[in-house]
Amino acid sequence: MTATPAPRTSLGSLSVSRLSLGGNVFGWTADEAESFAVLDAYVAGGGNFIDTADVYSAWVPGNKGGESETVIGNWLSSRGNRSDVVIATKVGAHPAYKGLSAATIKAAVDESLTRLRTDYLDLYYTHYDDESVEVSEFLTALDDLVRAGKVREIAASNISAQRLEESLAFSDREGLARYVALQPHYNLVSRDTYEGELADVAARNGVAAVPYYALASGFLTGKYRPGSTVDSARTAKAATYLDTDRGLRVLTALDSVAAAHEAEIATVALAWLAAQPTVVAPIASARTVEQLPALLGVAELTLTDAELKLLDEASA
């Protein structure tokens, strides 16, 4: 795969591709060699926005957390391309660095930088809100990291509309670094996890959405069908959508739109997400190089108003 120019969109001061590559599989279902191949193909296909977290993949027996960052760091070091990619990681869920106290944030960022083999992060998320900590404490700590040059932009994930608004107001009032992005759980079969109050706060405040679970644990690839068996670590979660009328309606609508464009179902699901207000880049992961074209295709696929309406109605 040769390098091709790809559309970029603004995320604060950053310029990112229309698909963010999820790093949760690196060091979990993809070993280092497989991960390197996926990362190489993603960049060759025009991608530049890599998402990970310090906790990936602590849930795997024998892992401690930090495995994904380590794989990505080794790849960055071997390829010498740090300035060509946008690296996003998260703080607050690593077994050794839980929560958002100032001390935790400042210790965790240095561990992430070491594993990623870099001296700065492009985007640093609070992975889960920590309501035991005042927004003033963690935002001041994050601002310190920006001022120190360790972090370029900050963002939030898994936060309520109220706390997001409170955080933005504090940053504005105090002149501190401000969240430029929000990473919500959002896809065609999980709309109420973002739409409504949370999306309204993001839109009012110019905060970009970078949705995770963009393909609903693989359900929106279309490979899970009634009566089918899929060998995947995420099968149980994806299969739950088959038991709902909405899940089946969405698959039918995706089949129709995909056929009209001669596109993969996953590409259509991502294109719907990319067309939603505030969304700049959905996140999707690939365990193999063969899974990437359907994901990268989102940058080239524009759905018609009628197709968007069909998918809206099927997923309502």
What are these model-derived regions, one by one?
Residues 22-33, 91-103, 131-132:
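Active-site mouth loops of central-metabolism enzymes
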Residues 113-132:
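Active-site groove signature of glycoside hydrolases
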Residues 31-42, 100-115, 164-169:
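Short, acidic/polar
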Residues 56-61, 93-98, 291-294:
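A short acidic, helix-capping loop that chelates divalent metal ions and anchors anionic groups
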Residues 43-44, 73-84, 113-117, 146, ...:
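Acidic (Asp/Glu)-rich catalytic clusters
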Residues 49-53, 86-89, 120-125, 155-156, ...:
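Short beta-strand segments at enzyme active-site cores
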